[in-house]
Regions:
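A conserved short beta-strand within the histidine kinase catalytic ATPase domain
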Residues: 154-161
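Glycine-rich/acidic phosphate-handling loop/turn and adjacent ATP-lid/helix
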Residues: 166-197
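Conserved catalytic submotifs in the C-terminal HATPase_c
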Residues: 113-126, 163
Length: 226
């Protein structure tokens, strides 16, 4: 078994725990809102009219949380299916967008905003034949590298750009950041950077720091050889 495959279970556990925690929050809000409605209704028929606005607000909250819950379960289902094939043809932009949705809770805990950036050039989508789960792991590891140096209120933009004629994923940190040399040193000395290097190597790719714009640049082959 490849050394990166050993870490896939831990990665799956971390992401799944994050999404199920979000689902627990959804259910807690629905329970609280429905409980309030039940309390009002149990007072008397007249109370329903008196507190109609509160009931209406509770119904809106419940509807919003149901939609949020459906979205979360869709994400989890799609994530689970990323293991269907060892090697698969994937749309890189779609994978970036998938990762950003999966990582929202982790960013929120750091008080950091995650955003995807549309491809710099329109045209055919960028596709790779690679290990889908490990690609998600590499993208997530790059975010964790950024989290180590970012302050609350920062922003991470992830998108595809051309780099030396090849497609590359640029993970750009913005906000109250250390100076360029300190940014590079702090990330390169972190455990997350070592993990990112290992995962990138398993994917026959590379991860480099671009200090000119506080950025991590990820490059992967169009088709993995093994």
């Amino acid at each position: 078994m490849d050394k990166c495959q050993d870490k896939e279970v831990a990665f799956f556990g971390k992401i799944t725990a994050g999404i199920t925690h979000e689902l627990k929050n959804v259910l807690a809000i629905i329970r609280e809102s429905s409980g309030l409605m039940g309390d009002i209704i149990s007072i008397s028929p007249e109370a329903v009219i008196k507190y109609q606005e509160k009931i209406q607000n509770s119904m809106v909250r419940i509807k919003d949380q149901i939609e949020r819950g459906v979205n979360l379960t869709d994400r989890l289902n799609k994530f689970a299916h990323s293991t269907d094939e060892t090697l698969s043809k994937i749309d890189l932009q779609e994978t970036i967008e998938q990762l950003v949705t999966l990582a929202q809770r982790f960013a929120r805990l750091k008080h950091v905003v995650l955003k995807t950036v549309p491809p710099s050039q329109e045209g055919q989508p960028v596709t790779l034949v690679t290990r889908h789960v490990q690609l998600l792991m590499a993208l997530f590891a790059s975010l964790e590298c950024c989290f180590t140096v970012m302050s609350a209120g920062g922003e991470i933009n992830i998108g595809i750009r051309k780099n030396k004629g090849k497609n590359a994923v640029h993970v750009v940190c913005k906000g109250d950041l250390p100076g360029q040399s300190e940014f590079v040193r702090n990330i390169s000395e972190s455990e997350n950077w070592a993990a990112l290097q290992e995962i990138s190597a398993c994917l026959e790719g590379s991860a480099n720091l671009d200090e000119t714009e506080h950025c991590i640049v990820l490059m992967f082959p169009e088709k993995i050889s093994r």
